[in-house]
Amino acid sequence: MSIVVKNNIHWVGQRDWEVRDFHGTEYKTLRGSSYNSYLIREEKNVLIDTVDHKFSREFVQNLRNEIDLADIDYIVINHAEEDHAGALTELMAQIPDTPIYCTANAIDSINGHHHHPEWNFNVVKTGDTLDIGNGKQLIFVETPMLHWPDSMMTYLTGDAVLFSNDAFGQHYCDEHLFNDEVDQTELFEQCQRYYANILTPFSRLVTPKITEILGFNLPVDMIATSHGVVWRDNPTQIVELYLKWAADYQEDRITIFYDTMSNNTRMMADAIAQGIAETDPRVAVKIFNVARSDKNEILTNVFRSKGVLVGTSTMNNVMMPKIAGLVEEMTGLRFRNKRASAFGSHGWSGGAMDRLSTRLQDAGFEMSLSLKAKWRPDQDALELCREHGREIARQWALAPLPQSTVNTVVKEETSATTTADLGPRMQCSVCQWIYDPAKGEPMQDVAPGTPWSEVPDNFLCPECSLGKDVFDELASEAK
């Protein structure tokens, strides 16, 4: 069944209510998806894109009900990925000589998928036009790496419709086609999820490409995407959101995610979150167990956040596999303007923390101090976690803290004057163990109240057995 988009433009795509995985199993399409194909019937008949390959036969049969396939004059392929051009082989078997208009890179992609170099390819580049009669033209705009090298958009003059390819789309299936007909909360959640998980790596390209398109000074009455809704009501709203999201986007939000073997790291996550909330109640904090949560929801929250705390138990002296995989994915997504801190519990060694901190730094995050706890955290260890959260809230605050929390901090500092007189706490740079002068280290005959300067030179870190030379002043206390 076709749907009139505008005048002589019809949607001839395919809804996919059941799909739950995309890009293999990397993207969870919890609300299904659609594969949008458009038929333009002017003096020349143009088909823009096809559908996913698994619907090839159904697509060609439905298209045959709309038009004699021999009457299709041109096929435009904005993107060669299988969910866009997947039905080409089935269609071209019926009309093998029909010209295909696409970018030079798309020819390589199409042949790589379909293996038909004999098809009638016609290369287009930015600014090229194709006259389709009745005073209307198609104008082509290359958009390489949004999100494949072959990508382009197509603009139809007269009707002022931009066929935008993957940009401005969402994996969202609904019986209605237009943006003003669907649930707005669901729609914009899926738009942001789509951008965060698919287009984030190319944010640096989004703004200049949108600026280039706007530079054509062409009116845009509708944006017809390759997935999800057609934007007919205020279509520029999604363009404005893309410009916002592309500009090193962050909200006053912190995401905490972790994996754990014995719930020890979960206890740390909860305590850290408590400390953040105590110090800055304005900040939104979300906690996820990666083993039980939707990975794409976690990544969307990271995209929205000013910072992320990542927790892992130590297993075989490295981080938990699900954490390693998610950090690798964050590396590929290339988030910008975000801070990070690693935390976790361990038994006899804590190698995961150092490895995790390094990986987060390699992923482009600005790193804050990490935090370790040995075995199951007791009340003292949980208080250290809460204090870590308080310090994170202070360091990552986007605006001056509320006066009530500032007063609390001042009061705590006043009550701790005696402790402060003992000098700073010191942290082992290898295992992150903290020496607190107020507590000393009775196991090595270092009495409570002993400043670091008076600790014997033969002192060894209780965790990793290294000497005083590997200790640094605790970063949160450095002046």
From Swiss-Prot:
Cell compartment(s), UniProt: Cytoplasm
Binding site for Fe cation 1: H79, E81, H147, D166
Keyword line: Cytoplasm, Electron transport, Flavoprotein, FMN, Iron, Metal-binding, Oxidoreductase, Transport
SMART domains with a match to the protein in the record: Lactamase_B (SM00849)
Residue numbers binding Fe cation 2: D83, D166, H227
Subunit-structure text: Homotetramer.
Xref: NCBIfam families: PRK05452.1
PANTHER family: ANAEROBIC NITRIC OXIDE REDUCTASE FLAVORUBREDOXIN
Function: Anaerobic nitric oxide reductase; uses NADH to detoxify nitric oxide (NO), protecting several 4Fe-4S NO-sensitive enzymes. Has at least 2 reductase partners, only one of which (NorW, flavorubredoxin reductase) has been identified. NO probably binds to the di-iron center; electrons enter from the NorW at rubredoxin and are transferred sequentially to the FMN center and the di-iron center. Also able to function as an aerobic oxygen reductase.
HAMAP family, alphabetized: NorV
Protein's recorded name: Anaerobic nitric oxide reductase flavorubredoxin
Native organism: Shigella flexneri
Lineage: Bacteria, Pseudomonadati, Pseudomonadota, Gammaproteobacteria, Enterobacterales
